Regions:
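Ligand-binding/active-site lining segments
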Residues: 14
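Short beta-strand-to-turn element immediately C-terminal to the catalytic PLP-Schiff-base lysine
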Residues: 21-23
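A short, conserved beta-to-alpha structural element at the edge of catalytic cores
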Residues: 138-144
Length: 152
């Protein structure tokens, strides 16, 4: 656990990784750390489950409420990010990541658990398996320039 100063507006963990504090006395155990990767679509089902509300359906989100309770739950294997913090001055990036690895659309792979600032791309033949797995996940997601939504 390192302190990272600066980096907002960058695709490294310094700009995209945000800590989440969950507080529900008597329900969510104190001093618990959950390493699950979640994305924004997971918040609505999580809040619904935590409050006993009916979840929206259909949804891409997964509740991470069980993990907050210290249970296994149904954690995501990875998350997909389409990142363009400054559309007027930066080119969009696509990447997929899990708790340890991150693969960009340009095929750069990083071991983010050990290289938080992404200084050393992983190129070793030993990374072939994880690269293939993450590439398969990335291939399922919209590519740059695709229309993501239609309003008919």
């Amino acid at each position: 656990d390192k302190v990272i100063v600066g980096g907002k507006g960058r695709p490294t963990d310094a700009g995209t990784h945000v800590a989440l504090i969950a507080y529900q006395p008597g329900t969510v155990p104190a001093d618990q750390i959950c390493k699950s990767v979640v994305d924004f679509s997971d918040f609505a089902p999580t809040i619904a489950e935590a409050t006993g509300a009916q979840p929206l359906s259909p949804t891409d989100g997964r509740s991470f409420f069980p993990q907050l309770l210290g249970r296994k739950g149904n954690p995501r294997e990875n998350i997909f990010i389409y990142y363009c913090p400054k559309p007027e001055t930066s080119k969009p990036l696509r990447f997929v990541r899990n708790e340890r690895w991150k693969l960009y659309g340009n095929n750069r792979l990083f071991d983010v658990a050990n290289d938080v600032l992404e200084k050393k791309p992983v190129t070793s033949p030993a990374s072939k398996g994880i690269r293939k797995q993450l590439q398969a996940a990335l291939d399922q997601m919209p590519s740059e320039g695709q229309k993501l939504m239609t309003f008919d």
